[in-house]
Structures are given as C-alpha cells and as structure tokens.
Amino acid sequence: MIRRVLLLSLALLLAGCANEALFRPKPALESAADAPFSVSGRLSANLDGKGHVANFDWRHLPPRDEVAINSPLGNTVAKVLRDPGGVTLLADGKRWQADDVESLTRQVMGWPLPLSNLVWWIRGLPAPGVESRVDADGNLEQQGWHIRFIRDADVDSDHPKRVEMQREGLTVKVVVQSWQ
C-alpha cells in the first residue's frame, strides 16, 4: 500500500514538472514599455525565511501603474499607485509616498518590489538601458536580481507564466493567472 502511494506521488510530481518549461528572455523592445496590459495572479515573497502570499491585479497604463494587493478571499488590502510624480502606497487607512516603488516597499513591507523592472520581466524581457546577462539556462541577471522565467510547456505564449526573482535573501515569485 505504501509503495503504491509513493509511486502515485512520484507520478504526480513528475507530471507537474512536465507541464513547465523555461521561458527564454527576448531582447527588450523600446515600444514594449508603452504597451498597456492588465494582469492578475499570485505573488509570494520570502525574506530570510519569513513568507508573505497575496493575489494581485495590476494595470499598466503608461506612464501609470496601479497594483491592487488582495487577500486570498479577494479583499483589497493595499494599493500601489505609480505615476511620473512618484509612488503612493495605500493600506490600513494609511498613505505612504516615495519617489520609487522599490524604496517605498522596502520601507513599508521590509522588502523591495522591483516594479519598474517587473514591467519588463513579467513579459519575459530584460529592462532596457540597464546591463543584463542571460545564462545558458535562460536565467536573467539584472541590477542584482537573478530572474528565472517559466512557461506552461503546452501553451505557446509571448510571456512567461511564472517569474521568480532572487536577491540578497529575498525570493519573489509572480504567477500569472490572466493576461490582457
């Protein structure tokens, strides 16, 4: 009986791995920055063993971004608003402001959300104008971040299904559930 359970578990594990493949970064196109999009999904962050998980809805309407951070039940618990004038974070009836998302989220949440680069990375593109390197496995190194792109193996898509970012004890994972 135990052997059957182990074999079934192994088969399910292998089947789950078979549905993913690496998504290789493409050269960044300047025109892509101006392409609006709406994306929903899940976000997880783990900083030195402490984890946070949330759902998100992100509207990118250049030069503005609006990211709603939602609880697992769908309630909006925070909003990040970015425009040329800076960034505002609204949560718990409070308002924080800064010049950029990275410093604001580091100050309030304890870890930086690289939104200015994530505009590119979520599409499987390196951010333009910034030095980057792609290794043999298709992983991107840019601005101190190690980025891994993963796609559904059975779906031909112009963007990755999952983006995993690591830097200085911090791992941020973004899983795309819908893209428009």
From Swiss-Prot:
One annotated Gene Ontology cellular component of this protein: cell outer membrane
Annotated signal sequence range: 1-16
Pfam family, one: LolB
Protein's cellular compartments: Cell outer membrane
Lipid attachment in record (N-palmitoyl cysteine): 17
InterPro entries membership: LolA/LolB/LppX, OM_lipoprot_LolB
Domain of life: Bacteria
Entry annotated with the keyword Acetylation: no
Biological process according to GO: lipoprotein localization to outer membrane; protein transport
Lipid-bearing positions (S-diacylglycerol cysteine): 17
Membrane-topology descriptor: Lipid-anchor
UniProt keyword list: Cell outer membrane, Chaperone, Lipoprotein, Membrane, Palmitate, Protein transport, Signal, Transport
Disulfide bonds: none
PROSITE patterns assigned: PROKAR_LIPOPROTEIN
Gene3D superfamilies: Lipoprotein localisation LolA/LolB/LppX (2.50.20.10)
Protein family per UniProt: Belongs to the LolB family.
Function text: Plays a critical role in the incorporation of lipoproteins in the outer membrane after they are released by the LolA protein.
Subunit-level organization: Monomer.
Protein name per UniProt: Outer-membrane lipoprotein LolB
Name of the gene encoding the protein in the UniProt record: lolB
